[in-house]
């Protein structure tokens, strides 16, 4: 599922990891324990491909996904819990936005036989197919299910994230990881 082979990480002449190798199989659960500065966060950033090792390689199975919850949260206040959780669906939101743009253009169009109108119809058809394929019709209910499962009440979902403590904000971030 996930293989690390001869991973070396060096910073400014200091070696943090020296040719470490490990394998994680399907269903494995791991915990990283160590003192501050031991490299736990660095290793997780390497595993999520957020950072690159000095040398060595990682191999992931095709459908393998790795996420980690960072220690420091970077929240923009003003979003609701749902709006923040929907950020996990970047591609769906892009497709949805383009669909809305096309609908607005089509509402203003008078010539339904023009080449440009036909091209818009073709693009909209492709977008609709893509939207369905990537789960666009289910992401909202899926998001609610995950958030409720993490302990949020239905009334919480439309509340601003800045009204929640750090622990509850961590749960929102965890929901985003689970939804990706």
Task: List where the protein language model places each region.
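ABC ATP-binding cassette signature C-motif
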Residues: 1-180
